[in-house]
């Protein structure tokens, strides 16, 4: 799946307006696919990687309902709740976006590559403040959570 990676800097056209009020947001974002439009309604659904089947089903259900009603779903592409939220959004025929703790050229965990591919094919995107090639190091994930 080849898809161009682009960079958008804070204060530049295309940088998410909703992040501008926060001083600790990244100075630049690396993007593969698309970013949600500033006028797009969004909701973040995140949770544990190790979770119950009930938790996964509820995350998927809420994401599907949100997506079916025009709300883009944002999560982290991790196993568990995050992946269920992305799957639900796709079932709801909506867009879904992932904020990564690694470079946008890396799918972590690797088992979610088919999910990431479908997200991109359906008009969503993946974004990160970490440059392409950045490995998914443990301390990257708390940093990315602020986005």
Go through the PLM ranges and name each one:
Residues 2-147:
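Glycine-biased, small-residue-rich flexible motifs in mid-sequence functional cores and linkers
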């Amino acid at each position: 799946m080849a898809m161009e990676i682009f960079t958008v800097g804070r204060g530049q056209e295309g940088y998410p307006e909703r992040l501008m009020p926060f001083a600790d947001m990244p100075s630049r974002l690396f993007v593969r696919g698309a970013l949600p439009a500033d006028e797009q309604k969004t909701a973040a659904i995140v949770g544990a990687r190790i979770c119950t089947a009930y938790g996964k089903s509820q995350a998927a259900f809420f994401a599907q309902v949100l997506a079916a009603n025009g709300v883009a779903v944002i999560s982290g592409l991790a196993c568990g709740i995050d992946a269920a939220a992305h799957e639900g959004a796709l079932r709801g025929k909506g867009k879904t976006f992932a904020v990564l703790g690694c470079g946008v050229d890396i799918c972590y965990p690797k088992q979610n590559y088919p999910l990431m591919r479908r997200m991109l094919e359906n008009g969503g995107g993946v974004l990160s403040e970490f440059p392409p090639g950045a490995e998914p190091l443990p301390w990257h994930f708390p940093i990315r959570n602020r986005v």
